[in-house]
Swiss-Prot record:
Any one GO cellular component localisation term in the record: cytosol
The organism of origin for this protein: Bos taurus
Pathway in which the depicted protein is active: Protein modification; peptidyl-diphthamide biosynthesis
UniProt KW Phosphoprotein keyword: yes
Pfam name, any one: TP_methylase
Record bears the keyword Nucleotidyltransferase: no
Name used for this protein in its record: Diphthine methyl ester synthase
Binding site residues for S-adenosyl-L-methionine: L9, D84, G87, S112, I113, L163, V225, H250
Enzyme Commission code(s) on record: 2.1.1.314
Length: 285
């Protein structure tokens, strides 16, 4: 059987009891490494799980899935995912492949950023469509996701922005030349995402458009949600462009405009100080 097991968001101990029991009896255990990361390394997980882990990067999962599914019809294989197993379409594809091969599967869920963002006090049922913000390059600066942000705000809905992760990525030159040389990992921060959003706002004004988001739009930055050093900051988009929330992983919420009094009271716990020097490093659980 193929087991898809969510690991939660914090550290090794965030796996469920059910998930841990399954991991310890599986013949092979894969750890997906490209859609998210935990705050602890592979060795810490192996020690707690009492099992050796096989790292599965994007290429392994998307192009060589048969290796993962090998013998899963006669033995138990675990595929571990940070957060919840269905946080990426790749994982659904793995289940479809297993089903076509006659391999049974079972999913063991866990917390993901999609529901854990409620820790900032914004009500989950008031979130609209989630968007992804990717690292811009000199030749690729996508803005199309901003239409979804606009639609959400028109409907009074908050927008969760998932920020880019670059793990085991090749440069264009190495990709063209077929060289297996990979760039250092990069994780987009809240301030980087806010800076790109501010540029989109300016671009829209230059084109004569009325931007759905401005420098004064209320936003919430979150870092390492679920970890002991989790941080949350609430402030304007302009303030988000300079706030320092520390190491990865980060997420950004663009509020829908009209807030419930309880939402406003909760966000007041995380408000960025007016003093810019104090606003550089924000805490708060």
């Amino acid at each position: 059987m193929l087991y898809m097991i969510g690991l939660g968001l914090g550290d090794a101990k965030d796996i469920t009891v059910k998930g841990l029991e399954v991991v310890r009896r599986c013949s092979r255990v894969y750890l997906e490494t490209y859609t998210s990361v935990l705050t602890v390394g592979k060795e810490v997980l192996e020690e707690f799980y009492e099992r050796k882990l096989i790292l599965a990067d994007r290429e392994e999962v998307e192009q060589e899935a048969d290796n993962i599914l090998k013998d899963a019809d006669i033995s138990d294989v675990a595929f571990l995912v940070v957060g919840d197993p269905f946080g990426a379409t790749t994982h659904s594809d793995l289940i479809l492949r297993a089903t076509k091969l006659g391999i049974p599967y079972r999913v063991i869920h866990n917390a993901s950023i999609m529901n854990a963002v409620g820790c900032c006090g914004l009500q989950l049922y008031k979130f609209g469509e989630t968007v992804s913000i990717v690292f811009w390059t000199d030749t690729w600066r996508p803005e199309s996701f901003f239409d979804k942000v606009k639609k959400n705000r028109q409907n009074g809905m908050h927008t969760l922005c998932l920020l880019d992760i670059k793990v085991k990525e090749q440069s264009l030159e190495n990709l063209i030349k077929g060289r297996k040389i990979y760039e250092p990992p990069r994780y987009m921060s809240v301030n980087q995402a806010a800076q790109q959003l501010l540029e989109i706002v300016q671009n829209q004004r230059i084109r004569g458009e009325e931007p759905a988001v401005t420098e004064e739009t209320l936003c919430v930055g979150l870092a390492r949600v679920g970890a002991e050093d989790q941080k949350i900051a609430a402030g304007t988009l302009q303030q988000m462009s300079t706030v320092d929330l520390g190491g990865p992983l980060h997420s950004l919420i663009i509020t829908g405009g009209s807030l419930h009094p309880l939402e406003m009271e909760m966000l007041s716990l995380f408000t960025i100080p007016e003093n810019s020097s104090e606003a550089q490093s924000i805490g708060g659980l």
